[in-house]
Structures are given as C-alpha cells and as structure tokens.
C-alpha cells in the first residue's frame, strides 16, 4: 500500500520507501511466544507510543490484547524509555485477571492492584504507584479515587473494554479523561456496537489533546 500525504505525515511514518512501524526486539523478560499478529500489534503500539499518538487496539476478544500491552511495557522498560508507571482501568470482573496475566507473562513486573476496601489512599497510594510498573484498578474505583490517582504522573493510561465509557457524559469517562498521562491506549473487542460514532468516542478517549 502506498501512502501520500503531508510532509509531517511522511516524516511520521518514516517515508514511503520503508515500512512503518519497524520491528522491535522482545526482551526475555516476556515469558511468552507471541504470534505474528501480536508481534505486529506490539510494533504498532510502540510506534504510536514513541510518537505520542493515542492508540485504539481493537483485536477480537481472546486474541491477546493484554499480552500485547504487557509486552509493550516490557519493551519500553528494556529500552529505558519508560517515564512513569502505567495505569490500567478495567471492568471489575477482569481486574484480577490483569494481575494474573502480568505474573504469568511478565513476572518481573511490579504490579499494584488498587481495588477493594483495603486499598491505599493519599500519600501511601502515590508512593505505591510511583514504585510500581503497573497499577490496575476498575472504572468504579476511578470514580471514587480519581483525585488521588490524578496526583500521579502516568506514562500510559490504558482503558480496557473501553467501549464501557464511550459516553463522554458519564462520571467514569470524565474521571479517566482528567488523569494526567503521556500516552493513552484504548483496548476493546467491540469498537463499534451500534453506530459509527462509537468509534469516534474511543478515538476521543485515546487522543484527548488532538
């Protein structure tokens, strides 16, 4: 496929004479054999992250979006380009799954699960987040603790099952938009459920500053 566009676009994709994004090296801290489409997904996520372009990863359910995201974080840690912790906001039902998958695929990653009645607050929460590689919480907790979490300068804010907050008027949507982050990623297996405007909502979540 040949692309034509502005000078900025040509510079962004590296020119039309070579493919973009380029292949990244997967570090041995990732305990998984990625399929080719997952490798391409990691390459693309890394490309978008390094260019500060928000991303929507919309692979079907069960195709390994969690693994691709964890691998991206491992790649950035290996290359020394991580600028802070990553926050994953997910439905309550999969918060525990994120911690389990991180322990399985990236066992060296420091993970904090911010959920439940015994969760941290205030300075203790900030310190725990800043010492972590990955913090996982739910949309419900974001509504309650968004002021505390907004004091952390996140490298990535990742929205799992992002279609759950496609309505910009909901408190969850407002809370995640208010979180400071260098880069944002929306993960969803159903980017369009009823109408095309839903895709626009997901793009707005990941490209807040554009």
Residue ranges of predicted features:
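ASCE P-loop NTPase motor core, strongest for the SF2 helicase catalytic module
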Residues: 2-208
């Amino acid at each position: 496929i040949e692309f034509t566009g502005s000078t900025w676009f040509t510079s962004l994709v590296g020119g039309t004479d070579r493919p973009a994004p380029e292949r990244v090296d997967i570090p041995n801290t990732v305990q998984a054999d990625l399929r080719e489409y997952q490798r391409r997904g990691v390459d693309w996520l890394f490309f978008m992250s390094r260019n500060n372009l928000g991303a929507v990863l919309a692979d079907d359910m069960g195709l390994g979006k969690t693994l691709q995201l964890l691998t991206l974080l491992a790649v950035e840690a290996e290359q020394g380009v991580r600028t802070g912790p990553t926050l994953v906001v997910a439905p309550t039902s999969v918060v525990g799954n994120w911690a389990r998958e991180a322990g399985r695929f990236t066992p060296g990653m420091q993970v904090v699960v911010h959920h439940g009645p015994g969760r941290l607050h205030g300075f203790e929460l900030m310190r725990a987040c800043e010492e972590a590689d990955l913090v996982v919480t739910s949309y419900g907790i974001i509504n309650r603790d968004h002021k505390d979490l907004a004091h952390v300068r996140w490298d990535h804010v990742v929205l799992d099952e992002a279609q759950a907050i496609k309505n910009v008027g909901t408190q969850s949507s407002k809370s995640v938009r208010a979180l400071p982050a260098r880069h944002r990623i929306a993960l969803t297996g159903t980017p369009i459920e009823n109408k095309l405007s839903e895709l626009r909502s997901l793009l707005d979540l990941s490209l807040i500053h554009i």
